[in-house]
Amino acid sequence: MLIGQIEIRSMKIIDLHCYPNTEPWIKSQGPYVEALAKYWNRAWTAKSEAEVIADLNQAGVEAMLVAFDIETITGAPPCTNEYVAKMRDDHPGVIRQAWAAVDPLKGERAIADAKKAIRDLKLFGFHFHPIMGHFSVDERKFYPLWETINELKVPVMIDVGTTGMGAGMPGGLGAVIRHAHPAAIDQLAADFPDLKIVAAHPGWPWTDEMLAVALHKGNVSWELSGWAPKYFPDAIKRDIKGRLKDKIMFGSDYPSIPYDRIFKEWNELGYSDELMEKIFHGNAERILGLEVQSSCS
């Protein structure tokens, strides 16, 4: 399969947004599993760790694994930081690093978990899912957590836009999509200018607002996972090759959309090989320091 004119397996691909897709991850989603199966129109079931690694190997990606913790809201056991750290250590040729997860609603416990994730487990940074976690990142009560993360000098990846979690269910299972409005990232970026923030997903229905934030805030970059590339809005397609060519990065949201489809549709967007190299690894290496990052750093 080609990306531009480059054989995909000859090009480095850093997948910034990759879930474990094993039983601990499925269980961590609690009541949202049924809604996800309906949203993606397929079974939402776990694979073995060996099967997941085989998927990533076949795709030729260097995965950034994502932990998951929304325990306060759902009571579901987290897909823990220890778990993704072990997967990283067990599969160094496939899993480049891993994003930690802490539940902001846990207060001081979240701060302690954050320190442990970086200092002891040597994880890369933190991922947050505001809709499922029932919080907005610009709420002042969570600022002690952001101050801690800022002091740890690691990046955060924050979901923007609507989600399949709870979609179509009565009341969305209590999830509120405004929690993932790009305006919250705009405020957080302004209040913590040294914090590197990666916005995750295109941000629909607020793609124009997310474009504005990415253009305005120097410490905000953007990965476009969880969305079939052929459905990217025209404004995003233009700015990928224009004003945001040095800020857009690749993520899959595995296991949401098959890698073959994602790569095929990125290829069909018709971008130059030089731009694709930036999107699929160069920007992540430069912005996030991944060219020197390792699991032992």
Stretches found by the model and what they are:
Residues 24-30, 77-78, 111-113, 168-171, ...:
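Short aromatic-enriched loop/helix-cap "lid" or pocket-rim segments at secondary-structure transitions
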Residues 123-125, 138-249, 296:
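Catalytic pocket-lining loop regions of alpha/beta-barrel enzymes
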Residues 2, 6-62, 242-249, 257-297:
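Mid-to-C-terminal alpha-helical segments outside catalytic/metal-binding sites
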Residues 51-55, 80-88, 113-117, 141-145, ...:
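A general structural detector for well-ordered alpha-helical segments in enzyme core domains, enriched
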Residues 18, 65-68, 100-104, 127-130, ...:
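A cross-domain feature marking catalytic cores of carbohydrate-active enzymes
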Residues 21-24, 71-73, 104-108, 162-166, ...:
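Active-site environment of divalent metal-dependent phosphoester hydrolases
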Residues 17, 56, 84, 126, ...:
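Conserved, mostly hydrophobic/aromatic
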Residues 62, 71-167, 176:
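Active-site gating/metal-coordination segments in enzymes
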